[in-house]
């Protein structure tokens, strides 16, 4: 099944990409959730015009992403989470928690969908999370999780 992505899908592509997927994946997951639309010649023409406009914006956004990366590189992020006596958290640290902590630490506003936490953070300590600002700009952000 040939589809045009309308949202970024990990492991598949970014908005505007034309992808070939299995029928069930497209019909049962991508189309109902609005992550993709069916490919037609008319839709392809629209996508081509959108890509040209995006290419012009892409150059500007790369510069912006590099500036944000510099700001994040000098940031000390500290998360206060409820924890038991043994240092184990009640729950875990989410990308929303990290985004709010970055903003509270005086950093730029970061979209929670851009933050990738490789392994669940369930105890106090020092961790590193990856922030994907741009396809060419990734930032490793050290965070300190402190029990309250």
From Swiss-Prot:
What species does this protein belong to? Thermobifida fusca (strain YX)
Q: What does this protein do?
A: Binds to the 23S rRNA.
| Keywords assigned by UniProt, alphabetized | Ribonucleoprotein, Ribosomal protein, RNA-binding, rRNA-binding
Instruction: Supply the PROSITE patterns for this chain.
Output: RIBOSOMAL_L9 (PS00651)
Q: Name one GO molecular function term.
A: rRNA binding
Q: Which family does it belong to?
A: Belongs to the bacterial ribosomal protein bL9 family.
Gene3D superfamilies in the record: Ribosomal protein L9, C-terminal domain, Ribosomal protein L9, N-terminal domain
Q: Which SUPFAM superfamilies match?
A: L9 N-domain-like, Ribosomal protein L9 C-domain
Q: NCBIfam families per the record?
A: L9 (TIGR00158)
Top-level taxon in the UniProt lineage: Bacteria
Q: What is this protein called?
A: Large ribosomal subunit protein bL9
Q: Which GO terms describe its biological process?
A: translation
Can you list the GO cellular component terms from the UniProt entry? Answer: ribonucleoprotein complex; ribosome
Q: Which InterPro entries match?
A: Ribosomal_bL9, Ribosomal_bL9/RNase_H1_N, Ribosomal_bL9_bac/chp, Ribosomal_bL9_C, Ribosomal_bL9_C_sf, Ribosomal_bL9_N, Ribosomal_bL9_N_sf
Which HAMAP family does the entry link to? Ribosomal_bL9 (MF_00503)
